[in-house]
Amino acid sequence: IDALEAEHTGLSVVPDARSRPRQRLATYLLELLADEWLIVAACWERWFFSEDGRAPSHRAFNEQQWGAIFGVGQSGLARRAAGARFFEDAFGISQARSNPRGPFAGLIQLGCTDATEPAWRDSLHRVLQALERHFDTHDYVLGGRPSLGDFGLLGPLYAHFYRDPVPGFALRVFFPLVCEWVERTNGEGCLGARRYGQKLYSVAADGSLEGRCGTSDEGDWLAEDAVPETLMPVLRTFFEEMWPFLKASIEALQRYVESAEHTRGEELPRKTFTATPGFEALQTGEGALTVPFEIGGVRARRMVVPYQIWMLARLAEAIRDCDRERLAPWLAQFPNGEEILELEARLEGVRVRKVGGRLFSA
């Protein structure tokens, strides 16, 4: 998105720092929440229903999807068989409950265990309920025009929920307005989706066709830098659940890069849903790159993901030119919300450099 924004400057999906600071910050917070927090419950939904003996099961669907990669050019059933072989060889899927590997081990490392799984699902459902109410009034996150926040949310909600048969069915049954938004934001055909830029027509008094904007809020973000009240419960999830974990992650990563175990400039664990090979001892158990966290009143432990620290630095840079006096009162409604304004200082001792898909301390 950053690359596309730089190349196509006509109509931005990122609100301007000076004229729309609250909306700008809100979109970056939503991107981070969706990409790195909602994804935990999304991965659970993806893999739980692929385990042996689960009912309902979307194992065959997942095998077919992965088989498209590992069985290119083969017949349909041969592709599915290729996906099934990969699941067994790489993930040991038939023994996922007794000897978790691959994404099944990754869920534990991300803090989604038998003890915390209900809390993760409850958190996800609260977010979906809030979004269902929000999309009753607004077609996109900030009104009638898509933003970075929409595309951030689209990642897990489209790929892991909407497309997968089991969670996708539940999404359609319980959150149909969220489904409409998925189709609208992804540019798919849907009678009620009202895509951005679409016009609706009616017959005027003189018999001519009269066009009007097809999306809510006159096809634009809300005026005067307003963030919809219906979006507040979603943003509150960031501050109540994710932000305490991120603060602990910053401190843990700083201790590690300043320790004798690491030399500045060396490689760090990558963005992944499992502990990075070579860093397993650090990112599992009581390793130096694990921290305690809490979700839904349940305390547990999970791995630190340096990519999230890189994303926080990106957020800090994005709001550097924003008017703090306009942001502070808005942030005050969230638990410890104003701490975001001191993000650059908090990250001073733990900078992360990204080179392609690799991460290094800086």
Predicted feature residues:
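GST superfamily/GST-like fold recognition
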Residues: 103, 141-161
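Short His-centered aromatic/hydrophobic patch
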Residues: 134, 156-191
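Conserved catalytic/binding loops enriched for acidic/polar residues
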Residues: 197-200
